């Protein structure tokens, strides 16, 4: 759900400001308005793939002659690691490290989408951080959901529970991933993020702007905010009108309903971000269409 504009911002930093971009591998092929980070690399941009924000901070320390920006994306699961990298950069005295933040929070997305869903399949790893209390509270608004794990057995169990409970005809919440997810979640991770980040309005690819669903660094940490550090202009991305990732994410259509699915849009040449990740429904569906 990282928007086109974020990819365009990263490309701007790389090509216009000469910044070395550190990023997770999947993000390299996500399309921007005119190109992806892979395309920018072909034009001379320095795009360095890392496995964690800590790797990006380490790279900055080892290359003091380069300005380094980590692309901080993901949800509650990955946000704490980005925060820790900023803390480490301050402790290490690095003035060449920053993060471009596009982290998102799920509760606001649930609120925005609750009227269009019968049942939410809540992501287990997110709830491992946030806990389940917010999801439980949504049942009072008539919203049903189950927390699922990530193995095939865990997913099928959660779906089976959801189907049975849905047929009972009243709002419900069931934690089907209790070995990892608790009511309170990770207080340590929550406190870290609360210390360093604050909520902001945020654009989701295919879903538009969801109020207070994004994160940004608090004022006391803003020297590590790439947008402020490089006085970046407002960049308005232009999504490909043929892309239906947003509709697929909301369950409004199947991947095969998209006119470019498996034709103009393939894992090798993705038009939408959902075709990039090997874990996405669209990517998984493509070989069997």
Regions found by a protein language model. Give the residues of each.
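Glycine-rich oxoanion-binding loops at beta->alpha junctions
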Residues: 3, 26-33, 37-62, 106
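Internal helical hairpin/lid segments
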Residues: 156-247
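A glycine- and small-aliphatic-rich helix-loop capping segment at beta-alpha/alpha-beta transitions
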Residues: 8-13, 37-44, 84-94, 114-117, ...
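Phosphate/pyrophosphate-binding betaalpha-module
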Residues: 71, 75-134
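A conserved active-site cap/scaffold subdomain adjacent to cofactor or substrate pockets
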Residues: 117-178
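Residue-level detector of conserved catalytic or cofactor/ligand-binding positions
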Residues: 283-289
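Active-site cofactor/substrate anionic-group-binding motifs, chiefly glycine-
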Residues: 1-30
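C-terminal active-site/capping subdomain that shapes the small-molecule cofactor and substrate pocket
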Residues: 232-280
């Amino acid at each position: 759900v990282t928007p086109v504009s974020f990819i365009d911002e990263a490309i701007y930093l790389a090509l216009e400001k000469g910044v070395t971009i550190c990023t997770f591998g999947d993000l390299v092929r996500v399309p921007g308005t005119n190109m992806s980070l892979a395309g920018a690399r072909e034009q001379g941009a320095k795009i360095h793939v890392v496995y964690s924000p800590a790797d990006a901070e380490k790279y900055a320390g080892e290359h003091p002659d380069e300005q380094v920006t980590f692309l901080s994306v993901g949800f509650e699961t990955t946000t704490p690691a980005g925060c820790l990298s900023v803390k480490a950069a301050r402790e290490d005295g690095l003035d060449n490290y920053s993060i471009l933040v596009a982290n998102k929070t799920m509760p606001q997305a649930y609120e925005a989408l609750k009227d269009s869903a019968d049942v939410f399949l809540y992501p287990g790893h997110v709830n491992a951080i946030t806990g389940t209390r917010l999801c439980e509270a949504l049942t009072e608004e008539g919203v049903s959901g189950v927390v699922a794990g990530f193995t095939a057995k865990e997913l099928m169990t959660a779906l089976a529970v959801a189907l049975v409970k849905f047929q009972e005809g009243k709002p419900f919440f069931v934690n089907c991933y209790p070995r990892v997810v608790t009511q309170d979640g990770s207080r340590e991770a929550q406190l870290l993020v609360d210390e360093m980040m604050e909520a902001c309005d945020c654009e989701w690819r295919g879903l538009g702007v969801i109020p207070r669903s994004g994160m940004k660094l608090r004022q006391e940490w803003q020297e590590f905010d790439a947008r402020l550090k490089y006085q970046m202009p407002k960049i308005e991305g232009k999504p490909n009108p043929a892309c239906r990732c947003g509709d697929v994410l909301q369950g409004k259509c199947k991947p095969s309903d998209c006119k470019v699915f498996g034709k103009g849009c393939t894992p090798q040449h993705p038009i939408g971000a959902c075709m990039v990740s090997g874990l996405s429904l669209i990517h998984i569906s493509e070989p069997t269409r």
